[in-house]
């Protein structure tokens, strides 16, 4: 009788052990899987960009502190604020930099040392800025071939030149931020201002063409709703539906 009971007893103890083992394996897989939403650094970039764009300097100040605490370097945050001037103008970009300077001074006075971070590498003197910028713009648009100017770019050729040679070359070629980060900052700024649906759609598509996932885009929209405004988030969701339908 003892020999008859042993297999049954083994099964009795093995089954709970197997259940526990499967549970532990599922936890390990969850821990090793990449996060689907925006990480802390990305969330900080979104908030800094949004508050700089809409001029909410009171909320910008804690957002800058959050960005530093999330691990962004001084130079990365400077780059975010400088990058934005091409979309929101010098005045608001300069306001953002002024607030950031004050935040750093206050932190230094309290004995907090923030990481300076990498500075931008010099651009090669031989860089063909027109060709480089045209290629960057085509990449953001998801186009293999560079298209000739049309519409407003053909109507005012000089702005096409400025876009290619300055925005998409002088600015985008700076290696402090990658293209995905730049596009994330751009859509945060554009989504925080009214009447920019067309530009937001282009750059939201550009962000996805630079590697922003649908889950990260959803996280961006949720953050916009929670920390910037439901009206801005609702308008951005309308644009996002169009972008997701084509990606």
Predicted regions and their residues:
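Bacterial N-terminal signal peptides that target proteins for export
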Residues: 7-17
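Extracellular/lumenal glycan-associated surfaces
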Residues: 50, 189-194
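Acidic, glycine/proline-rich low-complexity segments that act as flexible tails and inter-domain linkers
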Residues: 4, 28-42, 53-70, 76, ...
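Bacterial N-terminal signal peptides
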Residues: 16-26
């Amino acid at each position: 009788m003892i020999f008859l009971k042993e297999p049954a007893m083994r099964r009795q103890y093995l089954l709970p052990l197997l259940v526990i083992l499967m549970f532990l394996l599922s936890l390990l897989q969850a821990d090793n899987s990449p996060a689907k939403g925006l990480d802390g650094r990305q969330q900080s970039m979104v908030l800094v960009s949004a508050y700089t764009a809409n001029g909410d300097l009171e909320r910008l100040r804690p957002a800058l502190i959050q960005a530093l605490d999330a691990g962004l370097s001084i130079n990365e945050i400077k780059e975010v604020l400088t990058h934005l001037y091409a979309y929101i103008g010098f005045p608001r970009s300069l306001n953002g930099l002024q607030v950031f300077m004050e935040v750093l001074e206050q932190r230094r006075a309290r004995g907090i040392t923030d990481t300076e971070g990498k500075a931008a590498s010099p651009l090669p003197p031989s860089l063909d800025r027109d060709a480089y910028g045209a290629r960057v713009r085509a990449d953001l648009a998801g186009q293999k071939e560079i298209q000739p100017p049309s519409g407003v770019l053909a109507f005012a050729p000089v702005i096409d030149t400025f876009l290619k040679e300055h925005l998409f070359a002088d600015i985008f070629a700076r290696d402090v931020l990658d293209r995905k980060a730049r596009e994330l900052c751009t859509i945060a700024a554009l989504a925080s201002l009214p009447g920019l649906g067309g530009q937001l759609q282009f750059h939201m598509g550009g962000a996805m063409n630079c590697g922003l996932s649908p889950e990260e885009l959803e996280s961006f929209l949720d953050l916009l709703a929670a920390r910037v405004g439901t009206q801005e988030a609702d308008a951005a969701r309308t644009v996002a539906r169009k972008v997701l339908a084509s990606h």
